[in-house]
From Swiss-Prot:
One of its GO terms (biological process) is lipid catabolic process. This is GDSL esterase/lipase At5g03810. One of its GO terms (molecular function) is lipase activity. The lineage of its organism: Eukaryota, Viridiplantae, Streptophyta, Embryophyta, Tracheophyta. Its EC number is 3.1.1.-. It comes from the Eukaryota.
Length: 353
């Protein structure tokens, strides 16, 4: 009975939210995005780095079929989230030429492909560290304050949803391939190391006036096509369980750390968004979600290609990415991002209620 009441309340709240969106009003004043390639909207485009996506076939199903720097064939989960919140445009990449006075008032995207909780991960790939993303956010706050005044600006910052999605690069592009880190840390110890950075980040963001913060869990790392290729052994197309176990362990600690932060920071709404289970369910039961393929990605051979390896000359790229859970070796397709975003909507009710 309790479960029924809770579900009914959730459905009622969602219905009210959609009614509000129907009037043309947004549910929050702004949407702020930080993190890695899963949510990068083009901040790496003009950096000297191999981690870019501003060329075909990336973006082939996006608005105007343009490669904006998003690591997908189309929309990111955060793009769908912006739509669900009532925004008519997506948070603009802060370092892009499109970032101007008008669209900055409804938020911005500071994410950078190959960034992580650990700044060392981003530095290795010449990506934008999480520390620098926070500095860019402070600069953004000054710009908004100059436009609308301090009082209105503070209302925007405190009412905005700040979404952080990172951590996969720390494991897949750093820890698992770096023998030095392997000697220094066990996977469990490395998680603790990352979560100390996460805790500091949230406290700093809170100090800048943020009161609504969402953070995504790690995905099932061992089910990403590139991870299966790199760590699964020859001829294996099954998820790598030890990597998934590391992700589950990290996610448990992420939840506990977030609870402690909420208890110690008055007025903070902090939600941990579970993307592990929604993505795992799509991998295990693709047909239930309308997918045909969940082990290989759409781009190229589907086993490894990402960033510059996923290009217009990649042989074997699929013609219809909606059949695939993954677009490239590391990133979900637009269709999978839509499923993830719908899950975020339900989980995120505490941030907008």
């Amino acid at each position: 009975m309790k479960m029924f009441i809770t579900m009914s309340m959730c459905l009622s709240v969602i219905a009210c939210f959609y009614a509000g969106v129907g009037t043309g009003e947004t549910l929050v004043p702004a949407l702020i995005i930080m993190g890695d390639s899963v949510v990068d909207a083009g901040n790496n485009n003009h950096r000297i780095t191999l981690v870019k996506a501003n060329f075909p076939p990336y973006g082939r199903d996006f608005v105007a079929h343009s490669a904006t720097g998003r690591f997908s064939n189309g929309k990111l989960a955060t793009d769908f989230t912006a739509e669900n919140l009532g925004f008519t445009s997506y948070p603009v990449a802060y370092l892009s030429q499109e970032a101007n006075e008008t669209n900055l008032l409804t938020g911005a995207n500071f994410a950078s492909g190959a960034s992580g909780f650990d700044d060392a991960t981003a530095i290795f790939y010449n990506a934008i560290t999480l520390s620098q993303q926070l500095k860019n956010y402070k600069e953004y706050q000054n710009k908004v304050t100059n436009i609308v005044g301090k009082e209105r600006a503070n209302e925007i910052f405190s009412g905005a949803i700040h979404l952080l999605s990172t951590g996969s690069s720390d494991f897949l592009q750093s820890y698992y391939i770096n023998p030095i880190l392997n000697r220094i840390f066990t996977p469990d110890q490395y998680s603790d190391h990352l979560l100390r950075s996460y805790s500091t980040f949230v406290q700093n963001l809170y100090g800048l006036g943020a009161r609504r913060i969402g953070v995504t869990t790690l995905p099932p790392l061992g089910c990403l096509p590139a991870a299966i290729t790199l760590f699964g052994g020859v001829g294996n197309n099954m998820c790598v369980e030890r990597l998934n176990q590391d992700a589950v362990s990290f996610n448990t600690k992420l939840n506990n750390t977030s609870i402690n932060l909420t208890n110690n920071l008055p007025g903070l709404k902090l939600v941990v968004f579970d993307i592990y289970n929604p993505l795992l369910n799509m991998v295990i039961n693709p047909v239930e979600y309308g997918f045909f393929e969940s082990r290989r990605a759409c781009c190229g051979t589907g086993t490894m290609e990402t960033s510059f390896l996923c290009n217009a000359l990649s042989v074997g790229t699929c013609s219809n990415a909606t059949n695939y859970v993954f677009w490239d070796g590391f990133h979900p397709s637009e269709a999978a991002n839509r499923v993830i975003a719908n899950n975020l909507l339900v989980q995120g009710i505490p941030l907008i209620s």
